[in-house]
């Protein structure tokens, strides 16, 4: 059966019963129908919980993805089945990838979060609220320039873009304000996808409604004719934008097929944003659970690094254990096998591709945290391939455990769950890759590129070099950095698979996200508005006269 067929046959528990498992009363949730709810921001921590945090990340994936969310959900179910009270905390999907290449982002097989259709499509309206808030701010900025423009905002240096929750390459570069004096001031701008917006990052890093408003007020929208930054707070727009987002700030509660409480909230991409669900979602899960399992987008070089160097600084807690998801398919792909041949045994390609997994292991070990590798099982895997991965990981003093969450749900993930509990109780000495206060922006970027990606050197474009100087002048050197790069490679070139060395990492531009609290570095040709593939997932979706959807996988 397909994912959506499995989800359609599931018997869901009322969301009030799921809330009860977390000690939440009906007064502490706001129901969105029978099976979805938002959690009140003032929920108090339960004192008798262990508050253990498990981070699930992965190796560099194939274009189809490697089932990280599936393993995450299976692990959460397995822990509960073994009587370790657990909550899952994960990101909510963007409709761009849902209708583009992924077709859905709520796990797969018998490890899914439900109601699957609702979560993948409009859910509780968080992304719509973010889109509206973002574009309201854009409209306010354009109106300000058209009217008196008391702060002398330079229309050529407005960096705030509009957003849409779609993959629409035609909107990457646009001209607004055409049509004469009453239509505004003409200027070049563009659209980003909502998941890459600063407001998405702010929503995911805010710790309260007050913090949300403070962060929004710090957003830099552009520069004056004297090249001085102008913030939302200086324009006095922060309260209006906060009002639009006040409900979206509340975490969303749903369930897995096995009725594990799951908090799904916030959805920044890991390649063009920081790739982690909201701090409030993770903190709420930690407050109410013995174990919280959460994920970071794409590979450990992207979401993993950003969780540990960006989100952790706000959350104030590091993971007690890290799970790196690997597949035979992705390792063979990183070892040079063609996409069309990934269902065939290829031990030579697998051996070469192990360099990718080994680098991710060593990278996560730099943070001083215990690690286990989860081999996400595919039906095409052979015993020889599985054993090769286990043997190679053993040489790194890391255990690799076969999981079958897609076919068996939590029951296929018990061995991994037991290992995670063991690791979470082991001692660790967490450290960051860079010192956020001591290292300047350039040093931070170079440390990530060299220590995590394996680069020999970092090349900054002339534009990026000038921005480094200006950002230092503005006092932004003490912020974390968020590198936007391809998810398929350690380099900025998606064709360089495996574990390249002796390469130059290219940074072309810096983007200040002062409200979010970091500076984005755009590497290679990375774009913040994706496009659709040749055959979008949308063309294979159907809905009948009764509203039944097929093709959403």
From Swiss-Prot:
Its EC number is 6.3.4.3. InterPro entries: Formate_THF_ligase, Formate_THF_ligase_CS, P-loop_NTPase. Pathway: One-carbon metabolism; tetrahydrofolate interconversion. ATP binds at residues 62-69. Gene3D superfamilies: Domain 2, N(10)-formyltetrahydrofolate synthetase, Formyltetrahydrofolate synthetase, domain 3, P-loop containing nucleotide triphosphate hydrolases. One of its GO terms (biological process) is tetrahydrofolate interconversion. GO terms for molecular function: ATP binding; formate-tetrahydrofolate ligase activity. The keyword ATP-binding applies. Belongs to the formate--tetrahydrofolate ligase family. HAMAP family: FTHFS. This is Formate--tetrahydrofolate ligase. The gene is fhs.
């Amino acid at each position: 059966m397909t994912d959506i067929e499995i989800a359609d046959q599931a018997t869901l528990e009322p969301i009030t019963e799921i809330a009860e498992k977390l000690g939440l009363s009906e007064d502490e949730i706001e129901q969105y129908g029978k099976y979805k709810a938002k959690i009140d921001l003032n929920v108090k921590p339960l004192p008798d919980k262990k508050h253990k945090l498990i981070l699930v990340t992965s190796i560099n994936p194939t274009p189809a993805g490697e089932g990280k969310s599936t393993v995450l959900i299976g692990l959460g179910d397995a822990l509960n089945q073994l009587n370790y009270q657990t909550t899952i905390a994960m990101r909510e999907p963007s409709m761009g990838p849902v209708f583009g290449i992924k077709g859905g982002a709520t796990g797969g097989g018998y490890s899914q979060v439900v109601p699957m259709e609702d979560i993948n499509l409009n859910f509780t309206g968080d992304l719509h609220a973010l889109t509206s808030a973002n574009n309201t701010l854009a409209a306010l900025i354009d109106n300000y320039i058209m009217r008196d423009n008391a702060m002398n905002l330079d229309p050529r240096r407005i960096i705030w873009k509009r957003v849409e929750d779609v993959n629409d390459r035609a909107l990457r570069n646009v001209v607004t304000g055409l049509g004469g004096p009453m239509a505004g001031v003409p200027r070049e701008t563009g659209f980003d996808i909502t998941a890459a917006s600063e407001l998405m990052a702010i929503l995911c890093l805010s710790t309260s409604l007050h913090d949300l408003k403070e962060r929004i007020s710090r957003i830099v929208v552009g520069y004056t004719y004297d090249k001085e930054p102008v913030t939302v707070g200086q324009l006095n727009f922060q309260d209006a934008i906060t009002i639009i987002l006040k409900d979206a700030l509340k975490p969303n509660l749903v369930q897995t097929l096995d009725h594990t409480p799951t908090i799904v909230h916030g959805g920044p991409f890991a390649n063009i944003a920081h790739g982690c669900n909201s701090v409030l979602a993770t903190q709420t899960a930690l407050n109410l659970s013995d174990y919280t399992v959460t994920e970071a987008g794409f590979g450990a070089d992207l979401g993993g690094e950003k969780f540990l160097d960006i989100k952790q600084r706000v959350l104030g807690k590091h993971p007690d254990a890290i799970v790196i998801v690997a597949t035979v398919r992705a390792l063979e792909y990183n070892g040079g096998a063609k996409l069309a041949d990934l269902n065939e045994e290829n031990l030579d390609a697998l051996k070469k591709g192990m360099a990718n997994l080994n680098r991710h292991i060593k990278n996560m070990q730099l943070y001083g945290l215990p690690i286990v590798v989860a081999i996400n099982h595919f039906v095409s895997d052979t015993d020889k391939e599985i054993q090769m991965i286990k043997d190679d990981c053993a040489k790194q003093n890391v255990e690799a455990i076969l999981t079958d969450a897609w076919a068996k749900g939590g029951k296929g993930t018990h061995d991994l769950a037991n290992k995670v509990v063991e690791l979470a109780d082991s001692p660790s000495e967490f450290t960051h890759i860079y010192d956020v206060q001591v290292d300047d922006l350039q040093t931070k970027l170079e440390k990530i590129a060299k220590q995590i990606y394996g680069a020999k050197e970092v090349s900054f474009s002339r534009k990026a070099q000038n921005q480094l100087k200006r950002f230092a002048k503005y006092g932004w050197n003490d912020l974390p950095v968020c590198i936007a790069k391809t998810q398929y490679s350690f380099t900025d070139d998606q064709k360089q698979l495996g574990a390249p060395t002796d390469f130059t990492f290219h940074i072309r531009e810096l983007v200040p996200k002062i409200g979010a609290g970091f500076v984005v570095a755009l590497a290679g040709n990375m774009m913040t508005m994706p496009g659709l593939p040749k055959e979008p997932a949308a063309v294979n979706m159907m809905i009948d006269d009764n509203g039944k959807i097929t093709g959403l996988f």
